[in-house]
From Swiss-Prot:
Subunit comment: NDH-1 is composed of 14 different subunits. Subunits NuoB, C, D, E, F, and G constitute the peripheral sector of the complex.
InterPro entries tied to this protein: NADH_UbQ_OxRdtase-like_20kDa (IPR006137), NADH_UQ_OxRdtase_20Kd_su (IPR006138)
Subcellular location: Cell inner membrane
Keyword Transport assigned: yes
Lipid bilayer topology: Peripheral membrane protein
Nucleotide-binding in keyword set: no
UniProt keyword annotations, A-Z: 4Fe-4S, Cell inner membrane, Cell membrane, Iron, Iron-sulfur, Membrane, Metal-binding, NAD, Quinone, Translocase, Transport, Ubiquinone
GO CC terms of this entry: plasma membrane; respiratory chain complex I
Record-given protein name: NADH-quinone oxidoreductase subunit B
Family: Belongs to the complex I 20 kDa subunit family.
């Protein structure tokens, strides 16, 4: 006769839930916390930056999703690239990305950041910020609305909850 671990878990959960306990895996708790406390850093390069600021204002209020803009890359875990990335700004983008702590994510906002946009064939424009840094979520539009940005951020939250796992390196010394 096989042992039914699922029934045991349900019995244990039902007994503890009514008493204020919650059973979960450490990985799930960490990924939930990471997804619901994103600290974005703005890398506003053009018109899309205005829409990004609007998403943080009182009408859309990104703070209610646990997102608080940080002024320093060392304090943030999400970079929002908003606008036209030129060849001259590309090294600065990479440098700022490298200063961010792990885990870090990148959201590309607008047609120009996604693929060069209207200026795609210009000699001075990088045809997508994904040529410089790895991008997790693309938000289309010229410029995308604040609702589109918030939708992209919610998609990133889902991705973080799905993929983030807790990794412990036993070689680290404190």
């Amino acid at each position: 006769m096989e042992h039914d671990f699922y029934q045991e878990d349900e019995l244990l959960n039902s007994g503890l839930t009514n008493r204020g306990f919650l059973l979960s895996k450490v990985d799930e708790v960490i990924s939930w916390a990471r997804a619901n406390s994103l600290w974005p850093m703005t890398f506003g390069l053009a018109c899309c930056a205005v829409e990004m600021m609007q998403a943080a204002a009182s009408r859309y209020d990104m703070d209610r999703f646990g997102m608080l803009f940080r002024p320093s890359p060392r304090q943030s875990d999400l970079m929002i690239v908003a606008g036209t990335l030129t060849n001259k700004m590309a090294p600065a983008l990479r440098k700022v990305y490298d200063q961010m702590t792990e885990p870090k994510w990148v959201l590309s906002m607008g047609s120009c950041a996604n693929g060069g946009g209207y200026y795609h064939f210009s000699y001075s424009v990088v045809r997508g910020c994904d040529r410089i840094v790895p991008v997790d979520v693309y938000v289309p539009g010229c410029p995308p609305t604040a609702e589109a940005l918030i939708y992209g951020l919610m998609q990133l939250q889902k991705k973080i909850k799905r993929t983030t796992g807790f990794k412990y390196d036993s070689r680290q010394t404190h």
